[in-house]
Every structure is written in C-alpha cells, then in structure tokens.
Amino acid sequence: MESVFDYEDIQLIPAKCIVRSRSECDTSVILGEHSFRLPVVPANMQTIIDENIALFLAQNGYFYIMHRFEPEKRLSFIKNMKSKGLFASISVGVKREEYDFIKQLAQENLSPEYITIDIAHGHSNTVIEMIQHIKKYLPKSFVIAGNVGTPEAVRELEHAGADATKVGIGPGKVCITKIKTGFGTGGWQLAALRWCSKAASKPIIADGGIRTPGDIAKSIRFGATMVMIGSLFAGHEESPGETIEKDGKLYKEYFGSASEFQKGEKRNVEGKKMFVEYKGPLKDTLIEMEQDLQSSISYAGGKSLDAIRTVDYVIVKNSIFNGDRIY
C-alpha cells in the first residue's frame, strides 16, 4: 500500500479564506435521510452514551448511535424515540437472538432509522449475513456495518447491502486490540481511512484515534462522512459511569466495549478502563467542536465541509505538535 501515517503526522495546508466570519461556515452533514449539525457521533459505548444523552443529541440535531449492551431496553428505547418524533438509532450484534430481535421489530412495524452492526472484526460472514437479514426484514433502515480496516472489507459489506461502513480496528484510547492480537489500524488509522475511502461508494464513518478537534477535519479530508469519537466525549457531566475524586479533581470512568468491565468477565479482552478528567456539560464540548470545525472550513477556503475534502496536506512525521497539548 501507499505511505502510512496517522493523525499526528498530517498537517492540512490552508487555502484562501472566502468568508468574513467563521460563523458563516456550515458544519452540517447528511447521513441517510437526515441532516445533522456536526459530522461527529459519540462512540456507542456504555460510558459514553445512554438513553438521556441519545435524547439530548436527537433533540438538538446531532447524530447518535445507542450502544447494544442492554438489549432488553432496545425495544422501549425505539418506541420512546418515535413517540417523541425523533429518529431511532440502535446497535446490534450478530448472535442468534439478534436475528429474532430484528424479526420482532418487523412484526411490530418498528423500523429504526439507523441500525449499526457493531462487532470488533466486521469483515466476516456473520456481519454479511446480518446485513442481509436486516435488509430483508427492515428494508427502510439505514444499515451501518463495522468495524473494518481494508478496502476489500468495505466493498464486501457494501455489496451485501450496507449503507455505510465503519472503519477502525483498535485505534481508540481504551482499545488494546493491537497489543493483544498484533492486528489493527492503531498507529495508521488515518492512512487506513484514506485507503478504505478510495474503495467506498457509500459513506464511511471513521472510528477511533481522534485525540483533538483538528483530527475531525483530517478525517473529513481523508474520506469520512462521519467521525465516531470516544475519549473526547468521555467524562462529561451527563456521561454514564462512576465519578471519583482524586487530589481535589473529579474524574469519570471510561472503558472499552471489549473490556472486562463491559463484558463482566476476563475473557477475550481487547479493551481497558481509564479515568478521564471531568469536562463539564456535553453541550459545551459540542459547541467547541462546531466552532473549531467552522475554523477548519475557513482555513480550507470554503463555506462547507466539502472544502476540507480537497485541501493539500503534508506529512510531518510525529512532529507537528512539538510537545504542545491543549488538553
């Protein structure tokens, strides 16, 4: 493959600014039949999203994907969102009971607007079969399939009927797949995104490895329609998970979807737990992300996200921050 790089290795090159104010820049994105205020989605993890956060995001024009780790709540969640006139976006796995759940939704005439097939290694027959099953019983649902890390995987899942693919194998802050297995896109996630997006004919969701707001713009440049983020969305006032105090500072727990803390057992573990500093209200982070992305668009010389997709860039191996950290 071509040159390998990650987020910290890339600097986007500015183009002539055409706006008088960054507030003129539009950060909205279309996914499926809906438009959203930002091309970002909080990771569908237990310490990142719950029913209340999903409701807040949907009511305020943001995309969300509800996690799949409390399957008994999914039916009532879908009904509740639809009763409020909001879109329903859920996750499923590939076990036998998930097939029954999809059939149940069809029988009750409940079609979530978005269904994400959420497993660690998405380039598999089990995912292909689940895509086909959902498309048979819930043909109107927008199916996101993942996670994958190769063009072949993107093509196969699209061919099976996926409406979008999620790219990223273990680059996240609480994912240790690369350490435990030797496989993944950790350390070259941005190059993997570029590689996969060239093969894609449908939207790609970049998942994992986002450490700064600027990484969102870089993901857009290399082919992402939407960017899934875990660590930047962890630790908020509304975030699920335990809050602790240490040395006079507040922290909230954040753990991976394949960690023993989520699984409830120490078996096939590919995730870990950490505590992140308390960040305050979620809405403040969303506003900051929007403002930063508006600035990115202005530097790209346009008024919408499309401007970012065509800017030039340079590869500056591991040196662009020079030790700088904003968090």
Curated annotation (Swiss-Prot):
Any GO MF annotation of the entry: GMP reductase activity
Residues annotated as catalytic: 175 (thioimidate intermediate)
Pfam families hit by this protein: IMPDH
Enzyme kind, highest EC tier: oxidoreductase
GO cellular component: cytosol; GMP reductase complex
Catalytic activity: IMP + NH4(+) + NADP(+) = GMP + NADPH + 2 H(+)
Positions annotated to bind NADP(+): 204-227
Keywords assigned by UniProt, alphabetized: NADP, Oxidoreductase
Keyword NADP: yes
EC number: 1.7.1.7
InterPro entries referenced in this protein's UniProt entry, alphabetically: Aldolase_TIM, GMP_reductase, GuaC_type_2, IMP_DH/GMP_Rdtase_CS, IMP_DH_GMPRt
A single GO BP: purine nucleotide metabolic process
Role this protein plays: Catalyzes the irreversible NADPH-dependent deamination of GMP to IMP. It functions in the conversion of nucleobase, nucleoside and nucleotide derivatives of G to A nucleotides, and in maintaining the intracellular balance of A and G nucleotides.
Family assignment from sequence similarity: Belongs to the IMPDH/GMPR family. GuaC type 2 subfamily.
Protein name: GMP reductase
Organism: Clostridium acetobutylicum (strain ATCC 824 / DSM 792 / JCM 1419 / IAM 19013 / LMG 5710 / NBRC 13948 / NRRL B-527 / VKM B-1787 / 2291 / W)
Gene responsible for this protein: guaC
